Amino acid sequence: MKKKNIKYTILKTSYALFQQYGYHNVSVLQICQACQISKPTFYKHLKSKENILNYYFKSIDTYIPDEWYRYTDVTNYWNHITKGFLYLIDHIQLVGIDLYTENFIVNLKNETQTLIEVRAFHDTICDLIEAGQQAGQILNPASSEELYQIAMRLLSGYGAYWCMIQGRNDLKDEFIQGLSASFFVNEEAHHD
């Protein structure tokens, strides 16, 4: 098996085991047995079991369709911004509460961000925010960068709350309401 294929196999197998048995109920040894590799081979490709989560969240941009980045015909910038964030939330919900909670714990220990920043997503959201401000859909005068950072922190916060209450809230609706309030979205933009 090629080096890249081994790492891919470890990651794919790990996620399947985590989904089936829960993150804490799966050991590195079980991952190795399922992949038919030795522990030294595992550690040659990954630093730790926790490191597996980083790879899963680094791939978050693969869940955003290429078409979303092409928005030349868009007139409701607010709506397009929410679509982008809803793709991220879909990924979070697909991961599930168990793995997303573990991701929070790992990132708190390592003092890193929960969601890996994807440059293309960042740039597109900032462009859409500026266009939305110019169109009068977003009334908050803060810079697009500031509003982007607010949005990402809101997403982390609502994601953490979703984990704490075991998914008994509507993560999508609550996030969009919070984002709308933060951006001071013009009421008409909600109905286009």
Where are these regions (language model features)?
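Basic, helix-initiating cap at the start of DNA-binding domains
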Residues: 1-21, 25-37, 51
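Residue-level detection of the helix-turn-helix DNA-binding "recognition helix"
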Residues: 33, 47-48, 58
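Short hydrophobic/aromatic patch on the recognition helix
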Residues: 35-46
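A secondary-structure capping/hinge motif
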Residues: 48-52, 100
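Alpha-helical DNA-contacting segments of helix-turn-helix folds
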Residues: 52-60
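Hydrophobic alpha-helical connector segments
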Residues: 55, 66-94, 147-151
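C-terminal peripheral helix-coil segments that are non-catalytic and often amphipathic
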Residues: 83, 90, 123, 127-135, ...
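Short secondary-structure transition hinges
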Residues: 89-126
